[in-house]
Amino acid sequence: MSEPIKLHDLRPAKGANKPKTRVGRGEASKGKTAGRGTKGTKARKQVSAAFEGGQMPLHMRLPKLKGFKNPAKVYYQVVNVSDLEKAFPQGGEIAVADIVAKGLVRPKQPVKVLGNGEISVKLNVTATKFSKSAVEKIEAAGGSVTEA
């Protein structure tokens, strides 16, 4: 009966691991031109991956986009009056920190209140900006607005 195979006895099959060919190391093993053929750009240097063989490249075929991105543009986070009513059914004083605490907007960004939906509770809202319809609806419900 033979011994069980042990992990340290395992060897790869003969010819399974061929040594890597080191090119340019003598005439017998891809010496001189090292498998690149003779002459031409590809024999002398590597062509960039973006080169399309003289065809007009993709980045030049595509049209230029007009305009620019305004770095000074302010992106407001919006919250509607209906969302405020759902989040604060008891009414009262509401600041941006309270709106953030309820998870309606993210912190550290300006907040604009829009007039989508209906409102019936008295809210005294402080935010960065308000739409005209939001101001009308909040004041019609007996509340007030303050731009901070």
Curated annotation (Swiss-Prot):
One of the GO BP terms on file: translation
Keyword Transferase carried by entry: no
Biased composition (Basic and acidic residues): 1-12
Record-level Gene Ontology MF annotations: rRNA binding; structural constituent of ribosome
Keywords: Ribonucleoprotein, Ribosomal protein, RNA-binding, rRNA-binding
Superkingdom as given in the UniProt entry: Bacteria
Membrane-spanning residues: none
Region described as Disordered: 1-52
One CC-aspect GO term: cytosolic large ribosomal subunit
Family stated for the protein in its record: Belongs to the universal ribosomal protein uL15 family.
Function, in words: Binds to the 23S rRNA.
Binding partners and assembly: Part of the 50S ribosomal subunit.
HAMAP family: Ribosomal_uL15
Protein name: Large ribosomal subunit protein uL15
UniProt organism field: Corynebacterium diphtheriae (strain ATCC 700971 / NCTC 13129 / Biotype gravis)
Name of encoding gene: rplO
